[in-house]
Amino acid sequence: MPKVYIIDSPVPNAFATGRNPEHAAVAVTTALANALDKDEIEGVLAHELSHVKHGDILIGTIAASMAGIITTLSHWGMFFGGGDRDRNSSSSAIVGLAMMILAPLAAGIIQMAVSRSREYMADKSGGELSGNPDALADALLKIESYAKNRTMPGATENTAHMFIICPFSAKDMKQLFSTHPSTADRVARLRAQAKAMRSSGGAK
């Protein structure tokens, strides 16, 4: 069982970290503990434990690393690529510039797609684990209502994928490249899951 840590922060959020279940930890902020009720906190913890169970931390780290490598290689290709014959070619320069712009964008899109798919999976698995998808949906709405007005201190683009809700405020330009699906979509899926579980007698 991963250890659970409380981080002193004015912004409600949570994340899991660790390369595998044996070396993993889950962290929640003090603001989250104060803002959510018991069922909602259980839903958040179930979501994060699902990330641990499915190895999402390692997958997210690999995706972020690959995006960084692709970006770096595209920059190197611009400055060091091409033979002497093409070094002064305008067409070569145009291709190099296009690669420098498009490669990082493509890498970022791939990273976002991977991260978003893992968030959906963790929501579904977390709802099953807690037996209360509605509580997790309520938690996501509460966390976003706080987080959208304030960027979490210490949050970076390299760690954003780890959090249950994007740690950047709605005014932050980094929000445009969020690694998270829209909260509204996640909530809709969780509501549908809860309805299905109630129909089968499996939801709280």
What kind of feature is each model-predicted range?
Residues 1-92, 105-204:
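Polar-ligand-bearing catalytic/cofactor-coordination segments
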